[in-house]
C-alpha cells in the first residue's frame, strides 16, 4: 500500500499481530526498511515488489531499523536474493544484527539469571527465525542523508531506547517519519486491539528523548511496524501514550523499590500488575524496569 508519494507499507503476519516493512522507491535508488522474519523476503516482500514490476534484486539499500528477530531475521535471505544491495543499520546495534548467537544471548536470553525469560518454544522460534548470520555494509549514527531521486532525500534518525542503535527515517517531502519500534505506546496489540506485549526499552532516558524528538518533528504521517498508519493528531496521541507509559513504569518501579521489592523479576511482576497486565513476553518489561533502576 502506498502511504505517501514513493513510500509503501508492506504488511506480513506475525502470529496474532502483524509486522510491517517499508519501501521507498525513488527514481534513482530503492530503499527497503527491514527484512522481517527469516522467510519474509521471499514470501512477503518479493510478492509486493512484483506488483510494482520490481524484484528483490532491484533493491539498492536495505536499512535495518534495529536488532530484533522480526526486523532483521530475513537478512541472510535478502543478501542471497539481492547481493548488490547495501545493508545498513545503526552502528550500536551492528554486532547483534550481524551475529545470531550474540543477538540470542544478549538481547533475548540475558533475563534467565533473574528467573525469567522466553519459553523453550520461544527460544526455538527465535533461533530459527533469526535466519543465519549476515554482514552489514554500513553502520549509521544518525544524521546521514540517503538520496533516492534528484529531488528526494531522506534523513536517517538516531532513535535509541528500544535498542541502543535503533534508527528510522525522516522524509521532509511528505513529513513522514518511519519509526518502526522507536515508540510503542502502552503496548503492542493483536489485530483485535488487545494488548499483548509491553514496550521494551534498554534506556529509559534514551527512549524518552526519542519520543520527545519525534514529537518535535510533528510528523504528518507516523509509520511503525506494529500499529496502523497514523496521521498528525493520531500520531501526537500515540507519542503521548508512549511517554505516559515510560512515566508509569518509572513511578511503579520507584514505588515498589521503596516498598522493599528489589529483585528484578518480582519487581517486574509488580510493575506489570500496575501498568499491564501483559499476556505475552511479560519478561521483556524487565528491560524497561531495569533501565529505571539505574536512577533509583
Question: Where in this protein do the model-derived segments appear?
Answer:
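Conserved beta-strand hairpin/beta-sheet module of binuclear metal-dependent hydrolase folds
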Residues: 1-52, 169-182
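Short Pro/Gly-enriched beta-strand edge/turn motifs at strand-loop
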Residues: 2-8, 123-129, 149-154
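Metallo-beta-lactamase
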Residues: 30, 37-39, 145, 153-238, ...
